[in-house]
Swiss-Prot record:
Sequence positions that bind [4Fe-4S] cluster: 16, 20, 23
Family annotation (CDD domains): Radical_SAM
Record has S-adenosyl-L-methionine as a keyword: yes
UniProt xrefs under InterPro entries: Aldolase_TIM, BATS_dom, Biotin_synth/BioAB, Biotin_synthase, Elp3/MiaA/NifB-like_rSAM, rSAM
Subunit structure comment from the entry: Homodimer.
Pathway membership: Cofactor biosynthesis; biotin biosynthesis; biotin from 7,8-diaminononanoate: step 2/2
Protein's name in the database: Biotin synthase
Species annotation: Campylobacter jejuni subsp. jejuni serotype O:23/36 (strain 81-176)
GO biological-process terms attached to the record: biotin biosynthetic process
This protein's record includes keyword Iron-sulfur: yes
Co-factor(s): [4Fe-4S] cluster; [2Fe-2S] cluster
Similarity comment: Belongs to the radical SAM superfamily. Biotin synthase family.
């Protein structure tokens, strides 16, 4: 079985105006995460080279904040062009919040392959985890990305206190979008966050992967944040459950599995790594 590996570069971190209860980058909570307006292009390129060395096909340029403005758009485009020049075989993904069709077309021109903007959860449950913007505005950005000609990466976070009905509603909304890839994150509580709920267990997490693949058979199911903590020694069972991709290395503000450890284990299990996108 061939799987896709993706890596993340947090190129603008923290001080986000939004009040998403699951996120340590929100200015509404006090955390000790690194905060910076922009990462040096040379550092982004270095991280891209490391990602490629670690068998990654996807490389995601992530910025904190509600969405794109002119300055941030220019910066993400600069970063994309810099990475493309030095590491031409990576598929570039942008994750920059709300964006118009015109802004997304500019990203595509700069070499962005796919846009990631998660719905996070169901339309019904969303107001309980965020009050500073609407679920509908997130959905619209995904429609904008498709109109701009970008591939779509859209998923969300499980284990925030949502019901089984919420999960079903959430997946129905994803079915409307039919994303190229759909990331699954498992919420891990942080003492500084307002959201304090029991952690999912491994059986629940694997059921979520199975249910997602059943709902979205044509999408690449990607297991991302929380994989190591929630699934522990069972984390590689995700592929039997229907996953076709994982995020390797660190996440936005939390540590991930060392890329080399993932690669060693996956090779031992007989997996190969995608080097192009079908």
């Amino acid at each position: 079985m061939q799987i896709m590996l993706c890596a993340i570069s947090n190129i603008a971190s923290g001080n986000c105006s939004e009040d998403c209860k699951y996120c340590t980058q929100s200015a509404h909570v006090k955390t000790d995460i690194q905060k910076y307006r922009r990462k040096e292009l040379s550092q982004i390129v270095l991280e891209a080279k490391m990602a490629k060395k670690n068998e990654a096909l996807g490389f995601c340029l992530v910025t904190a904040g509600l969405g794109l403005d002119d300055e941030k758009l220019e910066y993400v485009c600069e970063a994309a062009k810099a990475v493309q020049k030095e590491v031409p075989n990576l598929l570039l993904i942008a994750c920059n919040g709300m964006a118009s069709v015109e802004q997304l077309k500019e990203l595509k021109k700069a070499g962005i392959f796919s846009y990631n903007h998660n719905l996070e959860t169901s339309k019904e449950f969303f107001p309980q985890i965020c009050t500073t913007h609407t679920w509908e505005s997130r959905f619209q950005t995904n429609l904008n990305a498709k109109e701009a000609g970008l591939m779509l990466c859209c998923g969300g976070i499980y284990g925030m206190g949502e019901s089984e009905e919420d999960r079903l509603s959430f997946r129905k909304s994803l079915q409307e979008l039919q994303p190229f890839s759909t990331p699954i994150n498992f919420f891990i509580a942080n003492e500084n966050l307002k959201l304090q709920v029991p952690r999912l267990n491994a059986d629940e997490a694997l059921k979520i992967v199975r249910d997602t693949k059943e709902a979205l058979p044509q999408s690449v199911v990607m297991v991302a944040g929380g994989r190591e903590v929630v699934l522990r020694e069972r984390q590689y069972e995700i592929f039997q459950a229907g996953a076709g991709a994982i995020v390797i290395g660190d996440y936005l503000t939390t540590k991930g599995e060392e890329p080399s450890q993932d690669i060693i284990k996956l090779k031992e299990m007989g997996f190969t790594f995608a080097s192009e996108c079908h």
